[in-house]
C-alpha cells in the first residue's frame, strides 16, 4: 500500500510523516512522531487513555484516522508543560493525588484541559461529564474531579 504524506502541528511544532492508509493517530504519534504520552489501552475507544486534543477538542487517537489531522493542530500531554513549569492541571493532579498507577493520567489530563479551555469555571457535573469517557481503575475518580475543580479555581479548593 502506498504511503501518504501527512503534515500537522504537534505540540506547537510542524511535523511531516508518511503514513499507511487507514492507520490511526495513536499509532502515528507513538511510532512515527515518538510521542509516547497517549497510551494504548483498549484500541476501541472505550477507555480514554489515548485522548488527545485536535484543534482544542478532545478526541480518541485510537479511533481517529491519522489522515484526518492533515493541517490541524494535535496536542498531547507532552505539550502541556511550559519548559520546566507544570501546567496548572498537572500541579493539581499532584496536589490532589489524582494519579496512582498513572496509566489513565495523560488521557484524563487532556480531557480536563479541553473542558477548561472551553469552560474555565465548570461545575462538578460538567467535570464528571468531561471525563466520563476516561476509565480509571485506581482512584475512584474523586481525586481527579477535585483536581480539575482546583485547577479551574486557580488551586483553591471548591465544593
Kindly label every feature range from the protein language model.
Residues 1-159:
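Signature of N-terminal electron-transfer/Fe-S-associated modules in redox systems
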Amino acid at each position: 500500500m502506498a504511503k501518504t504524506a501527512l503534515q500537522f502541528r504537534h505540540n506547537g511544532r510542524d511535523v511531516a510523516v508518511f503514513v499507511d492508509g487507514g492507520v490511526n493517530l495513536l499509532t502515528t504519534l507513538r511510532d512515527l512522531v515518538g510521542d509516547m504520552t497517549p497510551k494504548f489501552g483498549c484500541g476501541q475507544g472505550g477507555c480514554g487513555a489515548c485522548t488527545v486534543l485536535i484543534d482544542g477538542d478532545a478526541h480518541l487517537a485510537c479511533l481517529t484516522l491519522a489522515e484526518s489531522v492533515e493541517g490541524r493542530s494535535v496536542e498531547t500531554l507532552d505539550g502541556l508543560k511550559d519548559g520546566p513549569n507544570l501546567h496548572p492541571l498537572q500541579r493539581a493532579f499532584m496536589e490532589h493525588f489524582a494519579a496512582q498507577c498513572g496509566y489513565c493520567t495523560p488521557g484524563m489530563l487532556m480531557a480536563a484541559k479541553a473542558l477548561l479551555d472551553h469552560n474555565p469555571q465548570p461545575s462538578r457535573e460538567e467535570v464528571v461529564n468531561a471525563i466520563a469517557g476516561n476509565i480509571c481503575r485506581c482512584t475512584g475518580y474523586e481525586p481527579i474531579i477535585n483536581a480539575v475543580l482546583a485547577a479551574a479555581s486557580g488551586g483553591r479548593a471548591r465544593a
